[in-house]
Amino acid sequence: MFFFAGTAYGVPGAFTAVLMPYLVRRAHVDLDHIGWYVTLLFVPTWFQFVYAPVVDFWIRRKHWLVLLALIGGACLFVSCQMTLPDQVVPFLAFAFLAQTFSGLIGSCNGGLMAAGLSDEQRGKAGGWYNAGNLAGGGISATIATLMTSDGYAPWQFGGVLAAMMVGPALAMLFVHEPARKMEGTLVEAIGRLIIQVREFLWTKAGITGILLCLSPVGTAALANYFSGVAQDYVTHDLAGELAKLPADAAAKLVDDHVSHMIGIVSGLLGQGLTAVGAIAGGFICDRTNRRAMYLLSGVLTAAVGLGMAFSPTSESTFIYGGLMYALVTGFCYAAFTATVLETIGKDEKSASTKYTLFTAAGNVAIAYTGFVDSRFDKSYGVAGVVGCDAALNIAAVVVLGLVFWKLGSFGKSRHVPEPELPVAKVVE
């Protein structure tokens, strides 16, 4: 079920990572501006912890999830109706709203996992959840991208995005979730929640967990830029041929090649590899140290980035590098979710709020890492972009590894089933 929950959450993120860069790049917007747009659409996820407590109250989290998916899907649909580049402001405004509501979908999912799962299940759940988040959400954006290149109307590919956000969310209605029990008034309940969260954050596990999430490690930030940089790999590869063609024919050739490459990297093959990486990562995280696996995800990200940086700027480099990055991205996100769920532990009352604090920190890291990466495009080209991403991951892995080793904050290496509580006996 968490695969479907992840898909509902992942559609707006995939829009930001795949469809939005493709649409604005197609409208002849510079990659430098795309970096600003991606950063803008991540802003709601930085502050969602401020309003995330709402899903810890009133109706069940699964009902919140469906309601938020309906609103977010409608916002994405309207965003797709805007003409670029003339209506880029309302285009981004409705996408911004979709991200705002989808962030709360993530809060619902985190709360459901934290409250209902035992420790030995957290990696598995995180794997399937991120398979839906990345692969399921990514497929929606890929379908919309291909529909765009094939000349479909905005209402058609916008409708696909909305349907793939709302449809999977409805499956969560079949998940068993106990009714909410609120002690005292709403104000008193909110006060208790704030105290619980504040006390948790000042523990060693809370502080080091936030630092880990704020770092560039395992952010897989380049996943948000691949559809934007694809054109650079094409124009470099076809420079001689493009010089001989009229402007319209050259633009059509580039567009065809870009669509083909995005279809491979972000399509069924790429999303399938992402799902494999997420499920495998979740399996591994249930059997070893989760924080160590999170640091390993940063090393793997850097390895792919360095490989692309030192390879020729060609379509082959983009395709093979992008597919490897897709595989590693799944591993990164599964390790992130498993690490966060382990850090906050089993909690029914404030689970969504705690989970959102960590995901907000992680989204800040994704945004600033991608933003810094994109600054290297004008001076060093795409090799500088992927090289910067690798350097940030390596530096953060070294620093955090030393900090965790010094503080003894790597967490548990074994995740055994939690013992059942003894049944009370009535003495006659």
Feature locations, PLM:
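C-terminal transmembrane helical hairpin of 12-TM major facilitator-type secondary transporters
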Residues: 291-336
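C-terminal ends and interior cores of transmembrane alpha-helices
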Residues: 66, 70-85, 299-313
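Glycine-rich segments within core transmembrane alpha-helices of 12-TM secondary carriers
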Residues: 45-48, 123-144, 359-370
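Cytoplasmic membrane-interface "Motif A"-like loop-to-helix N-cap segments
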Residues: 57-70, 286-299
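Juxtamembrane intracellular "pre-TM" segments in multi-pass secondary transporters
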Residues: 180-209, 242-251, 422-424
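Helix-to-loop junctions at the C-terminal end of transmembrane segments
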Residues: 46-60, 276-290, 377
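Intracellular juxtamembrane helix-capping segments at the cytosolic ends
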Residues: 104-117, 331-347
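Helix-loop boundary and gating motifs at the non-cytosolic
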Residues: 1-45, 207-212, 216-233, 237-239, ...
